[in-house]
Amino acid sequence: MAKLSTDELIEAFKELSLLELSEFVKRFEETFGVTAAAPVAVAAAPAAGAGAAPAEEVEEQAEFDVILEDAGAQKIQVIKAVRELTSLGLKEAKDLVDGAPKPVLEKVNKETADKAKAALEGAGAKVTVK
């Protein structure tokens, strides 16, 4: 098998859809036993809170999945919203909407997830963020 250069790999990735890239990352992680998640620095507790039990500390979720539960009555508007949020083509976006419940975005920050949820709900879809 020919060895691909970094530039050739980047060009190949540019041609993939968001869902295809997500699947690639999952398989890469499984194959090599690694994770693509950025390391998260744990903030030290203030000295005043030193007596508090560590179980009381609640770690805020950093990555969210936006799940399309139902397209609702305005399916065309939902397909348009999905296309705006992702790099999917018309057929892929339609297949995603028809196959609900399905993830629209995976492992995104809270701000992106909230914006996506608002856009999809504005189009008439039922959406959950996990």
UniProtKB/Swiss-Prot annotation:
GO MF annotations in UniProt: mRNA binding; structural constituent of ribosome
InterPro entries in UniProt: Ribosomal_bL12 (IPR000206), Ribosomal_bL12_C (IPR013823), Ribosomal_bL12_C/ClpS-like (IPR014719), Ribosomal_bL12_oligo (IPR008932), Ribosomal_bL12_oligo_N_sf (IPR036235)
A single GO BP: translation
GO cellular component: cytosolic large ribosomal subunit
Keyword Ribosomal protein: yes
SUPFAM superfamilies according to UniProt: ClpS-like, Ribosomal protein L7/12, oligomerisation (N-terminal) domain
Matching Gene3D superfamilies: 3.30.1390.10, Single helix bin (1.20.5.710)
Annotated function: Forms part of the ribosomal stalk which helps the ribosome interact with GTP-bound translation factors. Is thus essential for accurate translation.
Record text on subunit structure and interactions: Homodimer. Part of the ribosomal stalk of the 50S ribosomal subunit. Forms a multimeric L10(L12)X complex, where L10 forms an elongated spine to which 2 to 4 L12 dimers bind in a sequential fashion. Binds GTP-bound translation factors.
Family: Belongs to the bacterial ribosomal protein bL12 family.
Protein name as annotated: Large ribosomal subunit protein bL12
Gene that encodes it: rplL
